[in-house]
Amino acid sequence: MMKLMLFSIIVILFSLIGSIHGADVPGNYPLDSSDDTYLCAPLGENPFCIKICRKHGVKYGLMLRLPCWCEYFGKIKNVKI
């Protein structure tokens, strides 16, 4: 019985790890007209990055590391802001 319970816990943990890693959303860092990324703060979701991503035709973005990162943004296209 103890082995079955331990096995069940291990299976559940591996499923959780798989679901966390499987949630990667594709995206990219948008560039301005000078081929630079947009730096913003604070880390995480912020209005400036969302505004930049919307200018690039994407609904949502956030600060990931230092530059803004846009979800589902594949091709890098320069936009004059």
Curated annotation (Swiss-Prot):
Any single GO molecular-function term of the entry would be: sodium channel inhibitor activity
Q: Could you say which tissues express the protein in this record?
A: Expressed by the venom gland.
The record lists its disulfide bonds as: 49-68, 53-70
**Main location, first listed in the record:** secreted
Residues forming the LCN-type CS-alpha/beta domain are 25-81
Q: What is this protein called?
A: Toxin-like peptide AaF1CA5
Q: What is known of its domains?
A: Has the structural arrangement of an alpha-helix connected to antiparallel beta-sheets by disulfide bonds (CS-alpha/beta).
Which source organism? Androctonus australis
Task: List the record's Gene Ontology CC terms alphabetically.
Answer: extracellular region
What the protein does comes down to: Probable neurotoxin that inhibits ion channels.
Cellular location(s): Secreted
The similarity annotation says:
Belongs to the long (3 C-C) scorpion toxin superfamily.
Keywords, sorted A to Z: Disulfide bond, Ion channel impairing toxin, Neurotoxin, Secreted, Signal, Toxin
Q: Where is the signal peptide?
A: 1-22
